[in-house]
Amino acid sequence: MRATLFDLERTIRQRRQADPSQSYVAKLTAKGRGKIAQKVGEEAVETVIAAMASDRDGAIGESANLLFHLMVLLADLDIALDEVLDELDRR
């Protein structure tokens, strides 16, 4: 799983500099941190709604969306995935 997340992190960091008309990450980044944070919030709510509805497939899909958008936000904050994982290890 870590390899998948590290690959995603690398892709997100590369695409932040891409043409916004060609990359969702670049388009979202161009809209600013507030919009990225809003997307994280939306995906979190959608994940909770799916969970409360006992919608397993929905919860999986929304969790993937949540992780993706959280990683876009972390990249915008210049926080490496390793830093978050290290914090989890400390806990």
What are these regions (language model features)?
Residues M1-S63, L67-R91:
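Flexible "arm" and connector segments at domain edges
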